[in-house]
Amino acid sequence: MAVISKVTYSLYDQKEINATDIIISHVKNDDDIGTVKDGRLGAMDGALCKTCGKTELECFGHWGKVSIYKTHIVKPEFISEIIRLLNHICIHCGLLRSREPYSDDINLKELSGHALRRLKDKILSKKKSCWNSECMQPYQKITFSKKKVCFVNKLDDINVPNSLIYQKLISIHEKFWPLLEIHQYPANLFYTDYFPIPPLIIRPAISFWIDSIPKETNELTYLLGMIVKNCNLNADEQVIQKAVIEYDDIKIISNNTSSINLSYITSGKNNMIRSYIVARRKDQTARSVIGPSTSITVNEVGMPAYIRNTLTEKIFVNAFTVDKVKQLLASNQVKFYFNKRLNQLTRIRQGKFIKNKIHLLPGDWVEVAVQEYTSIIFGRQPSLHRYNVIASSIRATEGDTIKISPGIANSQNADFDGDEEWMILEQNPKAVIEQSILMYPTTLLKHDIHGAPVYGSIQDEIVAAYSLFRIQDLCLDEVLNILGKYGRKFDPKGKCKFSGKDIYTYLIGEKINYPGLLKDGEIIANDVDSNFVVAMRHLSLAGLLSDHKSNVEGINFIIKSSYVFKRYLSIYGFGVTFKDLRPNSTFTNKLEAINVEKIELIKEAYAKYLNDVRDGKIVPLSKALEADYVESMLSNLTNLNIREIEEHMRQTLIDDPDNNLLKMAKAGYKVNPTELMYILGTYGQQRIDGEPAETRVLGRVLPYYLPDSKDPEGRGYILNSLTKGLTGSQYYFSMLVARSQSTDIVCETSRTGTLARKIIKKMEDMVVDGYGQVVIGNTLIKYAANYTKILGSVCKPVDLIYPDESMTWYLEISALWNKIKQGFVYSQKQKLAKKTLAPFNFLVFVKPTTEDNAIKVKDLYDMIHNVIDDVREKYFFTVSNIDFMEYIFLTHLNPSRIRITKETAITIFEKFYEKLNYTLGGGTPIGIISAQVLSEKFTQQALSSFHTTEKSGAVKQKLGFNEFNNLTNLSKNKTEIITLVSDDISKLQSVKINFEFVCLGELNPNITLRKETDRYVVDIIVNRLYIKRAEITELVVEYMIERFISFSVIVKEWGMETFIEDEDNIRFTVYLNFVEPEELNLSKFMMVLPGAANKGKISKFKIPISDYTGYDDFNQTKKLNKMTVELMNLKELGSFDLENVNVYPGVWNTYDIFGIEAAREYLCEAMLNTYGEGFDYLYQPCDLLASLLCASYEPESVNKFKFGAASTLKRATFGDNKALLNAALHKKSEPINDNSSCHFFSKVPNIGTGYYKYFIDLGLLMRMERKLSDKISSQKIKEMEETEDF
């Protein structure tokens, strides 16, 4: 098949429709001939096509036609285009609407774009009546009536026939088409002689109901039948037009969107492009439950017999395979044989005689049952990133389930509680070769962004790793027994006694070093915990090995160590019983007694406070503050439990060092004090979205408590532990949380999946070019991919070492730090980075040496400086800043920290050049990689708990998925959260007083009303403590009341006085007369007074000012005050004195003030902050996405392709159902370069292995051959001369 490089879209013209021979003229027929189910329209349901005689796999269908007897039917999707054109011409005479007469001798093709626009404005400017002296009629506005289903004159609602519109549009001369933006003959907007009947392939038979009658057909077929029926009856134009609209897109005339029609093919979630082209059902697939197997390695997958016997693989006949194929035929293992010349597939059964069908010529193929060691793709859904779908070697296993190595369970997010996986056997040899390299677990060992191994030990293996390291005094036999099949090459080196450390040294097998962890391949750490053996840890031994050598050594370590850990467990055993957890009831009884005592004290203190408030002894706290105090007391109780458990664990470890449960805790597996607290201490406060359950009927959550009870246990504090068991009410509270979590998970899965798809579609065409830059099409996004022009999986986060006077080269390091430090103090100066990005893990090559053997200090500095200068010029073309790399080498290789030899230094920099030269290839799909990593992380996060920043009643800066979603959607005209930071609190207080919402009701006023002879008197007594607590003054309260009354339209006359009642209270007396009806208006006034007398912006949030320690540098901090406020626009801050106040606006305000680059930086940091702590490594993908969203002059949402030339097919696969229609209307021509278009046209996309074009220059080979023959002949002559001389 030829490679398609360009595609042009256009509308079918009538000649193409008329050209088909298949005439549909019947509604029903016995054998369906001449109906919309005619067998000539294509092959269906196993029946061969009656036109071409092919099967449904080979026949793409044929079009039919139905006569519409010279009626003009508008193509429904282009009704708006026809109306647009009619707005530019006179419906009476057909000439263009114009302010002044125009001549037809202008040549529009010669005009520039600017001149054409000026002519458009001049000619197409509106006027009331036609300029044509023979017409002079007023211009008519034509619209489409949904009710009448035809075009009508808007003025008098009189029908305008389609034939008249058709005549007027086709009479527009071609030379005026550019003026009206017509791209093809306007007749193509209509059906005239025949209406096309689409092939059967797009309307497979399905069961559905119409008017309570079951139909075994397709809705499209049914709708086509209605069109044929109306055409046969020679119905009116409107009737046929309505039938065509119902078939094409019923939304045009009706809001009933439930029925399926032609527009469904390109719109909605299950459109045909997505279901049949972007992804589709495949043959040779299997699905089964998964289970673990100890006998297979990370690179293998176990397949049960019933799958092996069902799936078949192809073997193509060629000179290399013909003998093997003959053997397979002879041994009766071939299931199918395909003869290419006869185009015939033969099923081979035992005892069946086959004559003259098997020729075994090149191009033929046979199908045999899948064999061991064949590469097969398998994966677990949801496939959030590429580690979910891998290609491993098939191994035969017992039982009925697919078996996987426990080492890959983490990367596939799989456990063995009934999870299922799917597998697909690719048939194309090219695909098999590609998958066996690119999707092989060894290739995928290290995470694309994080750089740590994605495979590692799980569960019991972690405990085994910990216990094995601690074991002592093993004899050689015991060591060999533990090592099993890997013990053959173990060298005792003359020793009789061995420890677990020796076993690890043998398993590592390389003279590898790492500060504080490894020395010459020996572990120097105190313990081996989970950080050394599990996946996604930077200290993983497998990761360090692969950094030192290659992924092959890393995977081998995982395979060998996993085997050894399992053997250790099977020999020495390991088990945890309830007795390990709770040897006796002493500790739990003690904890229970403490908890009961403390909760009674809390309840007592709370009850005393409530009684004192009721008796008027004290002024009550605000609701938010009261809840905070109760919560802090309950948190103290929870923390007390955790402290007691930690002390208990410490004591148990002294008394019983072999306690298996504590071994697990020390190994970093499963057990932590919080989990133990739930089991042994208290189950704690149950929360929904971070808050205790809200009270419902009668001011309570459950009927177990008194109405309006303030009992903390009545709001979801569960005192009992799981060991003691929960009471009925406690169980209901725990289930209340479970219910909200399950609904959250269901909803969030869908929302995150939708956003993930959008981000991947947005970023899929972003690749690394041959210069290590990131590009999308021809647009440059980043100068340096991954900042280092090295593959993301090779880069490594390392500790950021701050300048110190004890360092060698301190002045140089300080100067560098001052240049780069801005990037490391982030998040409104609240955070200081602890890690930075190294171009590769050079620490595994750092071998300490003595002072005598070490490289000279100046030589090392010169070497670092020269390498960085060389790299800056040759690899980064002095465009990108790589000071951070120089800083890393100067600090980590600093002679004051470590002395190294010259050879070690040379090795490190040779490796540096090697990584720069060979790791990051052109075509690396960095966009898809980044999109997948971001999506996988925010999906995991949305499914775990939601977290927020502020605890008090302030604007909660939502973290997690919700905020990420808002940032990527970039909605305009919404309030943005603005953060103000200053060391001068008074400047923030002035903003707070003006913006914070306070109403009279919040001040707990005592309001009384009395009627005097000619007026009403309202007394408002407020305790001054409430005024102080709201951080306002008595004057502000007076202003609030005064402002409300002065603006009130129901008050006729008013006056006001303020009195100091006593030292605690202040009284505002208001004198009022109301407009008629007086009684009603008085009632209204008194009803709204507590809420309507207010100040600030109406909001349910307060604006607290919090203080924090801000970083100016790694060693310079200062106290800063911060507050967040919701504003539409920064102009609202214009009247305040904000000198020396840092204002952090939202994304649109940032863009409006500082421009697109500032918006990009804001978006990047804001997106990263939504992930919370520990996800700094996501900076690169966040930066890439932010750079893409801000690639044009304005930030663009992930939902749109407004900027940049997104292809029609990309828009169509993304969900724009109008993309193909618009492309056809405007006769667009597009190159096939992007991912979506390549997918559609079976072209290899320009990413990954498809980035480079491979070809062989035969001329070069001929020249090389000539040179070689000349060289050989001259060498022979030389040899002969030497022989003669001898």
Swiss-Prot record:
Primary residence: virion
Coiled-coil parts of chain: none
Compartments (UniProt record): Virion
Entry superkingdom: Viruses
Gene Ontology molecular functions: DNA binding; DNA-directed RNA polymerase activity
SS bonds (residue pairs): none
GO annotation, biological process: DNA-templated transcription
Entry-linked InterPro entries: DNA-dir_RpoC_beta_prime (IPR045867), RNA_pol_asu (IPR000722), RNA_pol_N (IPR006592), RNA_pol_Rpb1_1 (IPR007080), RNA_pol_Rpb1_3 (IPR007066), RNA_pol_Rpb1_4 (IPR007083), RNA_pol_Rpb1_5 (IPR007081), RNA_pol_Rpb1_clamp_domain (IPR044893)
Top-rank EC class of the record's enzyme: transferase
Keywords tagged on the record: DNA-directed RNA polymerase, Nucleotidyltransferase, Transcription, Transferase, Virion
The enzyme's E.C. designation: 2.7.7.6
Cellular component per GO, a single term: virion component
Catalysed reaction equations from the record: RNA(n) + a ribonucleoside 5'-triphosphate = RNA(n+1) + diphosphate
Entry function: Part of the DNA-dependent RNA polymerase which catalyzes the transcription of viral DNA into RNA using the four ribonucleoside triphosphates as substrates. Responsible for the transcription of early, intermediate and late genes. DNA-dependent RNA polymerase associates with the early transcription factor (ETF), itself composed of OPG118 and OPG133, thereby allowing the early genes transcription. Late transcription, and probably also intermediate transcription, require newly synthesized RNA polymerase.
UniProt-listed PANTHER family: DNA-DIRECTED RNA POLYMERASE, DNA-DIRECTED RNA POLYMERASE III SUBUNIT RPC1
UniProt subunit comment: The DNA-dependent RNA polymerase used for intermediate and late genes expression consists of eight subunits Rpo30/OPG66, Rpo7/OPG90, Rpo22/OPG103, Rpo147/OPG105, Rpo18/OPG119, Rpo19/OPG131, Rpo132/OPG151 and Rpo35/OPG156. The same holoenzyme, with the addition of the transcription-specificity factor OPG109, is used for early gene expression.
Family: Belongs to the poxviridae DNA-directed RNA polymerase 147 kDa subunit family.
Protein name stated in the entry: DNA-directed RNA polymerase 147 kDa polypeptide
Organism: Vaccinia virus (strain Copenhagen)
Gene name of the record: OPG105
